[in-house]
Amino acid sequence: MKQNNKKPLPSKTKEISLETDWIDVIETMRETNESPKSQNPSEEATTVNELSCEAKPKLLFTPTKSSLSIGNFPYKEFDPVLKFPGIHYTYSRERLWGTCVILSTLFWSYYVLSNSELLEFEASEYSLLFILIIALDALLTVSLFGLFHHLMFLTTNYSYTINSTLDISKGFFINVLSTMVQALVTVTIAFTKFVTIDFPIYVFSSLFLYHPLSRSRQLPTKMQLDGSGERKTDSSLVHQNPPN
């Protein structure tokens, strides 16, 4: 039998052994991978800037109800339960509970007024006290219902946006209506002998009507996108105690 004296074909890739000079290998790789530099340095800078922009994730987006969360727990205070047609305003669970508190307050004031034994006094004796109560009630109403609630929705970008003034005006109009109902309840209770229960009922109903304001938590005002394209909140704004 004839022996096969054919030499092996030369491989394009250089075989690397233990005795290979690694400095030569690295220099060879640099020479093969080196691309010709452009003559214009501005074009090279533009190419680098474009590549760096493409590598960064886009951070500009509009937060929605599903993306607004604290950690892994959804922000349940803003989950819509009822939504009125034609009005960009939603009722959460806490606001529904606060509405029940106001209705119970109305029922209690009606019960007090319907009892003739509780109205045996002259209103002129308490006129100064009535004016003071109404003034303090108006101050609390403006601070709680107007300012904090308005700024809360502006910072969270949930239902209202900064550019959408129409939705903000509708929501503020509804707040004014609820404020008028609350003031009517306060004045009704003030014209009875149960003046001392006016402020506890008002504070109680206000805290439940605007439940997120009664908790010391940081509202998520900054949203980010990670490398995978998923939306997440800033780590500094993650709440330690998740809502029940």
From Swiss-Prot:
Q: Which keywords does the record carry?
A: Membrane, Nucleus, Transmembrane, Transmembrane helix
List, as start-end ranges, the regions of compositional bias called Polar residues: 35-49, 235-244
What cellular component terms from Gene Ontology apply here?
nuclear envelope; nuclear membrane
Entry membrane topology: Multi-pass membrane protein
Give the transmembrane region(s).
96-116, 128-148, 171-191, 194-214
> What is the annotated localization of this protein?
Nucleus membrane
Q: Where is this region: Disordered?
A: 30-49, 224-244
Predominant location: nucleus
Cystine residue pairs: none
Protein name per Swiss-Prot or TrEMBL: Uncharacterized membrane protein C70.04c
